[in-house]
């Protein structure tokens, strides 16, 4: 059976994948990669961690959510023999907020001031926020040290894997949240310029698409996996 390897968003934990994994059911095997919550690791170090955890001897599809999109792209560009497809969810190939790029040199000095959970929940989940999702978000944030968060934010501000995306040889699916207030539509347009053949599924959802619209996301991903398996 094809394994769907799930690479998490900025928090790096597994809890926020629970609604999506439940919606997938038994239709596909899943493997969730977790990132160390206390280590100041950038994209290269996290990609090495993921590379070492990829399935061996069985086909797999990579799904990079938000922050992890560049990691999924970089690994897909390496052309693993068992890789069958690449899914990007609310993600990007380069810094999605280029106007903030110059601030990366200040991040090591800047204090991390937590935003009120209610405001953060509305930013990430919009009108679809629930108490359960809010608790899951709070749990994920508790596991993330300030130094780890700073390292990941700094990595986002300087990332550009556009060249790697052009070398990806497997089919690409992009899950687009039409109400995303974190990753702008310009990120998708950039990806489509590089990979015009990529399949795009737009879902009326905020940035936390997999959490707030798990059923629709699961149907899109399962349909994509069936397609790449049948064409294999």
Task: Walk through the language-model features, giving the residues of each.
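Conserved HGGG/HGGXW glycine-rich cap/lid loop of the alpha/beta-hydrolase fold
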Residues: 1-40
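Conserved alpha/beta-hydrolase catalytic His-Asp/Glu region
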Residues: 97, 115-166
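Short alpha-helix in the alpha/beta-hydrolase fold that links the catalytic acid
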Residues: 170, 184-193
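Acidic catalytic loop of the alpha/beta-hydrolase fold
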Residues: 178-183, 208
